[in-house]
Amino acid sequence: MTPFMTEDFLLDTEFARRLYHDYAKDQPIFDYHCHLPPQQIAEDYRFKNLYDIWLKGDHYKWRAMRTNGVAERLCTGDASDREKFDAWAATVPHTIGNPLYHWTHLELRRPFGITGKLLSPSTADEIWNECNELLAQDNFSARGIMQQMNVKMVGTTDDPIDSLEHHAEIAKDGSFTIKVLPSWRPDKAFNIEQATFNDYMAKLGEVSDTDIRRFADLQTALTKRLDHFAAHGCKVSDHALDVVMFAEANEAELDSILARRLAGETLSEHEVAQFKTAVLVFLGAEYARRGWVQQYHIGALRNNNLRQFKLLGPDVGFDSINDRPMAEELSKLLSKQNEENLLPKTILYCLNPRDNEVLGTMSGNFQGEGMPGKMQFGSGWWFNDQKDGMERQMTQLAQLGLLSRFVGMLTDSRSFLSYTRHEYFRRILCQMIGRWVEAGEAPADINLLGEMVKNICFNNARDYFAIELN
């Protein structure tokens, strides 16, 4: 019987152990997509307690707690921090088999140093007190944890109207060497069907000093904000393409669509597709000219529980996987961006694992001369960010593309404790390659495979995003 979560956790061959301990373990972290609040990094936020750093805002944990019958007041409601933590501690023993069980104990181990102890009601007091004592120390502040975890770069997720003042404050502090750069997330600027669109256009017009009436005005406003983001070091965009649409339109049609929407009219699905296509093609060309990377996160079915959405708002754990076809529309969109050789470096993520092979083969259609891995099939995302999901994504990437050119893992997280997801990924990567070697499916060449592992863990992302590190 193998003990739980030793130093060789998941490393079930000797070759995997060598790969992890000698090549993967000590690689820095290049976390190119996350949802950390830049204000907390700028202020070097000190966490009040374990709930504050670990459970607050974590919809993964809330989903598990609800499934365990926990009352909503103990998830997102007015219960005390300690009551919410105790509810989580009571849920954890029921999460065996869920990635939350592994994540929980990896996060207790690093950075808190808690080993050989499982979170449960019987250990809740001890773990709560031990972690809170550590959180009072200087090296457990927001910046302190990032430094402990050997982070070199993080890309936050930011709206085009954001001032980026916190990024500027961080950049001016020469004592803090981790790059904290904004990522451009313009969903509100092209989700024309949303009820909030008109209000957003007014805000975008205000910050860009542009009166948005025609499509060209929107392009002008977005270009000004792209320049603002570029001035703060941005090299990455991110798009939530819950549904992939494609329909072409001329400028007069786009002007009419925008004008009628700003006048309060409801648009047809075809008109929505025309508008979204035009914005994405325009933005893709801007990214290509600037050398940015675009990310497409495809296939979420959001806000399914309307009663809870009205009570609690979005992003609180009521989203799931969509099953709408997207191959043909995505192909047309990428091909349109590529017509004038203005398709930027692109990472494609799917939420439905059924679409893994779709994206794995789609990325091969648009690779770029002289640019290894220009089109990336991205890491297992959200519900696929677990052992089976990561294994499937990497296996299919290896079979349909080049695993050796993969830009690797990202946290996609709102928590400063989520950096151990990079460790989890690295262990799974080394386990997978070690098994290939054990089965005679890959050569037992530690130098060849060790360099490949180092590249996937850090070097490929550093080179792909072309961000100068400190």
Swiss-Prot record:
It catalyses: D-glucuronate = D-fructuronate; aldehydo-D-galacturonate = keto-D-tagaturonate. Pathway: Carbohydrate metabolism; pentose and glucuronate interconversion. One of its GO terms (molecular function) is glucuronate isomerase activity. Pfam families: UxaC. One of its GO terms (biological process) is D-glucuronate catabolic process. Its EC number is 5.3.1.12. InterPro entries: Metal_Hydrolase, Uronate_isomerase. It comes from the Bacteria. Keywords: Isomerase. SUPFAM superfamilies: Metallo-dependent hydrolases. Belongs to the metallo-dependent hydrolases superfamily. Uronate isomerase family. NCBIfam families: PRK02925.1 (NF002794). PANTHER family: URONATE ISOMERASE. HAMAP family: UxaC (MF_00675). This is Uronate isomerase. It comes from Escherichia coli O157:H7.
